[in-house]
Structure formats: structure tokens, C-alpha cells
Amino acid sequence: MLCGVPQGSVLGPLLFIIYINDIVNCSNLDAVLFADDAALVLHHKTFKQLQKQLNVEATKLNKWFITNKLTLNLKKTKVMVFHKRRNKKHIVKKFRLNINRVNIEQVNHIKYLGVILDNKLNWQKHIDYISTKLNRTAGIIFKLRKQVPSKVLLLIYNSLGSSYLRYALMAWGTVRNTALRKLQTLQNKIIRYMTHSPLMTNVTQIKKRSRL
């Protein structure tokens, strides 16, 4: 390799983290780093000043990349505005972020480290994402339930379904009860499939009987 870090190497991740460690000092943005993923956060009282300062800080960030002979992936770089006001149309129309003469796309939601963040912070997109995973898991378990024992089905559920429910729960778990009920309904369906129980069977009783 002439540049970069070999994928799968033992020292690669550590060397990369050391190399980019001072990125947090190149601007006044609050940085959240994980491996080669970064979220940069800036807040301000007024929208106008927010846009102005963010463009200034983005220029500093771009200079850091040039100095360190790195390239910022502008296609994967997005900007999202969190705002208290319900009417956000003026933000979508007026907000502009430019890096190296490229306009950065503004989005209403984005997936970061496995969690879908939305600009309203109602977590609806993430709930839908988990629901899709649970539905897929339910389909797999339904097809296999007559061919494999319940212990294997439970292992499949923990790997393909339950892991999504537990992941980052401290963040999105504050959603409304209506959203949680949607997930609970899907989970109950899977539990009934795993234990070969009729669809109207009380799930609480199933859990006690099966020690789930």
C-alpha cells in the first residue's frame, strides 16, 4: 500500500486513531469520533449565526484534512439541523454549507453508528428500521419453527431481532408508548412462533412457562 491503513490489520485501527486524534482541536466544533466515523456538532441561538459559523468551522476542518494529506468524503458528508420550531421549511430552503466549493446535502434523517437520527428526534425512522428487522426475523422463525428446536429459534431471535431492540436503547427508548407498543407486538408474535403457541396466547404466561 502507498497510503491508508490496511483493512483487517491488528495495528491499523490504533494507528489511524492516533493519526486523526487532533482533529478535535482544529475547530470549535464538538466532535464525536468512532473509528473513521465522525459527527461534528455546533449550536447557536440564531439560525443565521449558526450557518455562518458552521461554514467557517467547515473551512478549518477542510484545511486540517489537506494538511494531514487526507480526503474528506463529501458524498458521505451530510448536514442536519435540529430545531425547536415546528415549521422548518425556511431552514430547508435557506441553509447552505459549502466545503471546498461543494454544497453539502441537508437531510432530515441519517444513520450514524447503527442508529437513525431524525431532525425532530422522535425516533420514528429508527422504530421503522427496527420493525423491519423484527418482521424479517419473524418470517425466518416462522419458516423454521417446525424444523428446529425452540433453543435454536431463541438463538436466531437473539442474533437477528433482539440485538436491534437492545442496541442504543438508552437513546431511542424514550419514544412514545405507541411506538413501543408497535415493537412489543412484533416481539410477542416472534415469542409465540418460537414456542409454537396460538396467536392469542398470553405472552406473559409463555415467558414464565418457557423461562424467556
Predicted feature residues:
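Short linear motifs embedded in intrinsically disordered, charge-biased segments
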Residues: T178-L212
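Active-site palm subdomain of RNA-directed nucleic acid polymerases
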Residues: P13-L42
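Basic, alpha-helical interaction scaffolds
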Residues: R101-A171
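Hydrophobic packing residues in well-ordered alpha-helices of helical domains and bundles
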Residues: Q51-L54, A58, L72, I127, ...
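Catalytic palm subdomain of template-directed nucleic-acid polymerases
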Residues: A39-K63, N122
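Short, conserved non-catalytic motifs in the polymerase core
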Residues: M1-L15, V41-F47, L97-R101, K120, ...
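Charged boundary/loop elements
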Residues: T67, K75, Y167-T178, Q184
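Short, conserved micro-motifs composed of acidic
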Residues: V56, T71-N108
